[in-house]
Regions:
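Short, basic/aromatic-rich helical patch in the C-terminal catalytic core of site-specific tyrosine
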Residues: 56, 70, 212-226, 233-234, ...
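Short, polar N-cap/turn motifs at the start of nucleic acid-interacting alpha helices
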Residues: 79-80, 208-209, 228-249
Length: 271
């Protein structure tokens, strides 16, 4: 028998993409992580790993970044000077930094760091996004930077990236590579995302193991279902409307009239 090669790339998260609000569905995983957060005093390492898993998913969901950009995001702690723009451009990396004026954590990434840097989306301008202080995101970032991240490093050389591995005696580096970051994400989904009827744990029945690339599918599909706009969906994943139409067109709501009515009916709801 010949193995079927053309597998549906959306299969692992189809149960999420077919929901009316895919992002609200996927968000259940981050809620599950918070619900099962270990006590940091009794189980410091387990708590640090849970916070890291929470932030991987949350920052991925807020930014729509590709795996490499998320994995290589540098950290500039509060009170420290941000890395020069030139350094970030040369190393093709972004940085998570504290914006004192806005009172928020900001993701700053030069356009050259992106796979599609020549895309009309960027116009040679950097990507800048203030992370919203919603559902304890800022609190968890602060706790991770101050307590959990140093614990995960365990005295190993600091690679400077926001996300670091749990350093073991055999570890040569605290940096994630493409494989280890994918495995960390997949493990998070297996532990918190996939509903297990025997234990009652896990957020979503029917979900399958997957990696960080699927987050972009969730965001694009969510916006497409809510707005019917390829253009708005493209903003969420730093891409073009053509690419979104090509990849996600099948998830566009079939009943366009209902979609338009949903937008218009808001006015009557407000009255």
């Amino acid at each position: 028998r010949v193995a079927r090669v053309h597998r549906d790339p959306f299969e692992p998260i189809l149960v999420v993409l077919e929901a009316e609000r895919p992002l609200a569905e996927y968000r259940k995983i981050t809620d599950e992580i918070l619900r099962r957060m270990p006590d940091a005093r009794r189980h410091p390492k387990a708590a640090a790993e849970a916070v890291r898993a929470f932030l991987m998913l949350r920052i991925g969901l807020h930014t729509g970044l590709r795996q490499r950009n998320l994995r290589e995001l540098m950290l500039c702690a509060r009170g420290a000077a941000p890395r020069p723009e030139r350094w970030l451009e040369q190393h093709r990396r972004g940085e998570l930094r504290w914006d004192e004026r806005a009172g928020a954590w900001e993701v700053y990434i030069p356009s050259v760091a992106f796979k599609n840097s020549g895309s009309s989306f960027f116009g040679k301008r950097p990507f800048r996004l203030h992370l919203p202080d919603l559902s304890s995101l800022q609190e968890q970032i602060d706790a991770y930077v101050e307590r959990h991240r140093p614990l995960l490093l365990g005295g190993c050389g600091d690679p400077g990236t926001f996300f670091v591995k749990s350093v073991k005696a055999t570890s040569r580096t605290a940096s994630y590579d493409q494989t280890t970051f994918y495995e960390a994400w997949r493990l998070t989904i297996q532990r918190y995302g996939i509903f297990n009827p025997y234990t009652g744990r896990g957020a979503i029945p029917g979900l399958l193991p997957h990696g960080p690339h699927n987050v972009r599918d969730v965001l694009a599909t969510h916006i497409l279902k809510q707005t019917g706009s390829y253009e708005q969906a493209s903003y969420a994943i730093q891409d073009t409307p053509d690419m979104v139409a090509q990849h996600y067109g099948r998830f566009l709501p079939q009943d366009k009239a209902t979609l338009a009515a949903k937008v218009l009916n808001v006015v009557w709801d407000e009255a």
